[in-house]
Amino acid sequence: MPRDYYDILGVDEDASDKEIKKAYRKKAMEYHPDRNPDDPEAEQKFKEASEAYEVLSDPEKRQRYDQFGHDGVDSGAGGGRRGRGRGFHDIEDIFDAFSDIFGGAPGGGRGRGRSERGRGRPGSDLRVSLSLTLEEIAEGTEKNLRLQKYLECESCDGTGAEGGMGGQNFSMCPKCDGTGEIRQVSRSVFGQVVNVQPCPRCEGEGRIIDNLCDDCGGEGRVQGEESISINVPPGVMEGNYLTLGDAGNAGLRGGPSGDLRIEIEEEPHEHFERDGLDIYYDLHLSFPEAALGTEVDVPTLEGEARLEVDPGVQAGKILRMRDRGLPDLEGSGQGDQMIRVHVWTPQELTAEEEELLDQLRAHDNFQPRPPEEDTQKSFFRRVSDVFS
């Protein structure tokens, strides 16, 4: 038998949207698969919390659930469900279309029904940059961020009124009679035209505050600092971003919080250049090493590794170290580490060194010649031969 959605989130049946959202965020952070790898029970609880929030955050679905239970929201009842979990994107889903690696507020929770009219105005979104090393990108990492932002005023529970919801500090707006709207009806040759605008007296809230909170001056929010912890999956790249729903600035007088968008930046690396999933490293060899072959230790993202260089390697040759690059964000493969060979030529020689090199220069093996694949006639030369 399916568990009760209110029990899953740990809230009462008369819980407000704000309480439901807060409970869901707590459960999601506690049971998120990134925080509980290889824990099937935590993954199941995360899915249950997500399913419960999808229903209880939607006024229409919640009404059907309250009236008919699970039958009211299961497939085929009351219009059916749109697919489990599709109403939101969590930190894994942000990479689905990855220009959206980090995309979307849970449960479409920014929308509000008519019963929530007057719960303040939404807070603005925040954008921050997160700088990562290639090593962190390769392994995935957990980062702590300290944010300067608007926080909900604790003194008034975000209402802007002294004493919060428990106080008798609100009265119906006399201008709009609590509707939050001003309707103006005019007549034209086409009939009646109704113009609806937010009430300027109560700013569309339908109520006015009689006694303002001293701490926030009636805004329901104060400036402060908040620390958050985020899990960055392996394989992200410059320009990707994470979106954490409801982690932006708190709204005015109980309005929903904005989102937090975390944009990924890659730190320059002392050894490597990135090209997609591959990384490039420049290997400098002396002339004898290139001619005779050698074994060298080269840096990789996992530490030093031994590389064997065959005799006669040419400058510009690309050597490949398989699976030493970066992982694919969606887990479908691993890049390689590419080694660009550079042959170093000495600029100052002793008389003895000049004599040795002069002797070598006379031998046929030291005369430059093109690689085997270049000894064939070019396409244009072969075409020319046909018509000559």
Curated annotation (Swiss-Prot):
Residues 27-50, 58-73, 113-124, 362-376 have a biased composition (Basic and acidic residues). Zn(2+) 2 binds at residues 173, 176, 199, 202. The keyword Zinc applies. Its cofactor is Zn(2+). Coiled coil: none annotated. One of its GO terms (cellular component) is cytoplasm. It is found in: Cytoplasm. Transmembrane segments: none annotated. Zn(2+) 1 binds at residues 153, 156, 213, 216. Binds 2 Zn(2+) ions per monomer. Participates actively in the response to hyperosmotic and heat shock by preventing the aggregation of stress-denatured proteins and by disaggregating proteins, also in an autonomous, DnaK-independent fashion. Unfolded proteins bind initially to DnaJ; upon interaction with the DnaJ-bound protein, DnaK hydrolyzes its bound ATP, resulting in the formation of a stable complex. GrpE releases ADP from DnaK; ATP binding to DnaK triggers the release of the substrate protein, thus completing the reaction cycle. PANTHER family: CHAPERONE PROTEIN DNAJ (PTHR43096:SF48), DNAJ HOMOLOG 1, MITOCHONDRIAL-RELATED (PTHR43096). HAMAP family: DnaJ. This is Chaperone protein DnaJ. It comes from Salinibacter ruber (strain DSM 13855 / M31). The gene is dnaJ.
